[in-house]
From Swiss-Prot:
Compositional bias (Basic and acidic residues): 303-348
Annotated stretches, region: Disordered: 303-354
CDD domains per record: UAS_ETEA, UBA_FAF2, UBX_UBXN3B
Gene Ontology cellular-component terms listed: endoplasmic reticulum; lipid droplet
The entry's keywords: Coiled coil, Cytoplasm, Endoplasmic reticulum, Lipid droplet
PROSITE patterns, sorted: UBX
Protein name: FAS-associated factor 2
GO MF, one annotated term: protein-macromolecule adaptor activity
Source taxon at top rank: Eukaryota
Subcellular location: Cytoplasm; Lipid droplet; Endoplasmic reticulum
Amino acid sequence: MAAPEERELSQEQTEKLLQFQDLTGIESMDQCRQTLQQHNWNIEAAVQDRLNEQEGVPSVFNTTPNRPLQVNTADHRVYSYVVSRPQPRGLLGWGYYLIMLPFRITYYTLLDIFRFAVRFIRPDPRSRVTDPVGDVVSFIQLFEEKYGRIHPVFYQGTYSQALNDAKQELRFLLVYLHGEDHQDSDDFCRNTLCIPEVTNFLNSRMLFWACSTNKPEGFRVSQALRENTYPFLAMIMLKDRRMTVVGRLEGLIQPQDLINQLTFIVEANQTYLVSERLEREERNQTQVLRQQQDEAYLASLRADQEKERKKKEKQEQKRREEEEAQLKQMLEERKKRNLEEEKERKSECLPAEPVPDHPDNVKIIFKMPNGTRVERRFLFTQSLSVIHDFLFSLKETPEKFQIVTNFPRRVLPCLPSEEIPVPPTLQEAGLSQSQLLFVQDLTDD
């Protein structure tokens, strides 16, 4: 499988990458980038996780799974390396061995019978795990009190947390089960595990989790891994999508031999991690691509929805404008019809035009707003409202108007008002027998 092409980093990501390298001292730029990507480029989270890793503390950003991760211990491809105790040498050695053999057999037989009988009387208290983190921390404290502080970085968390972090970070996890009652445990811890070469090797290549089988958490792990003797080491990694035991080391192993055996296990199984890392990167890129496609689809959908919304708004606005135009036209037509009916009613109510030789005749010439002239006779005794009604009844007369004399210019009070409740007669208004009046349009005022 070819490695997918790495995406180019933005300027902000490049700055975070360099800052993370300065803070952590990691020389590999690829490792820095991978760590930041695992934390979504959150530099504070990545630095804190790196510090936790150096101290063996589980990641505070990786929550513990609700169910413990299952470990495949039945893989037939598990590499097993057992160190047998050295055979007796010489006549004296064999003699001592043969003399002590019956006592050893008797001791271990009686011990097994005693433990078996005790289980019927009182259940093994180690079977109840109440504080797994406390069990691990307590073992680490006792280990440092007995063997000093020069040792591999212990993972300060539960076995399940260690499995989860190893799975998430695609790293090897070395599990050490400490048998306090075994005769080789003290020698292994003092002369193998705490040797600087071994310590540096483990710290740089894998996570390291350890606990005593006398602790409930260690006993629980012991029941799962089923060791045969002590010291016991198990190498666990993500293989075929499962956390799998790929190596078992049992017995008192020497420092260089331990490094060689672990190196062999790592190199034999490194391809699985590389393959899983490539698949994970491919899945991440596929997920990113799918997310980008989803975002593009949502953006397109929102654009279409916005376009449809604007279209509906435009249609709704057009519909309202058409309705308003229709309503306005209907009101104008009704107003026009009412005006025509009012003009017709005023025309029917007008008194008849007096004969030309009537002594009270007043001949008035009206100059209309459109420039035309209208002539009619009225009586001096008639009210100015008659003049107004006559002009109102004409088709060319605007809806609102006023009547003005020429000289001196004054507006004739043809309609009732608060000052003049009853309009005066033509004579009272001072009109002469032959009069020119102007009709002014007030429609726009």
